[in-house]
């Protein structure tokens, strides 16, 4: 069974963990629809990136009409 050869001190443990912090998100507004999106990513609301539509949006289906 593997066990540590030497005890890891609090200082060494904390120095190792110094780079593990999470970075807060920095959302930007989409120039096409105004929704918040991640920088350098396609907008999830409208599918635009760099003033072009790169992901076609599916037509919305009204479930109330199809149920009857």
Swiss-Prot record:
- One of the record's GO cellular component terms: large ribosomal subunit
Q: Per its record, what are the GO molecular function terms? A: structural constituent of ribosome
Gene Ontology BP, a term: translation
* Taxonomic superkingdom: Bacteria
Q: Which Pfam families match?
A: Ribosomal_L32p
The alphabetized UniProt keywords are: Ribonucleoprotein, Ribosomal protein
Output the PANTHER family linked to this UniProt entry: 50S RIBOSOMAL PROTEIN L32, LARGE RIBOSOMAL SUBUNIT PROTEIN BL32
Similarity field: Belongs to the bacterial ribosomal protein bL32 family.
Checking NCBIfam families in the record gives: rpmF_bact
The entry's protein name is: Large ribosomal subunit protein bL32
Gene source species: Rhodobacter capsulatus
């Amino acid at each position: 069974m593997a066990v540590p050869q030497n005890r890891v001190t609090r200082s060494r443990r904390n120095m190792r963990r110094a780079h593990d912090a999470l970075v807060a998100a920095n959302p930007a507004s989409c120039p096409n629809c105004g929704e918040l999106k991640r920088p350098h990513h396609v907008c999830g609301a409208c599918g635009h990136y760099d003033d072009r539509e790169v992901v076609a949006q599916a037509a919305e289906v009204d479930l109330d009409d199809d149920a009857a």
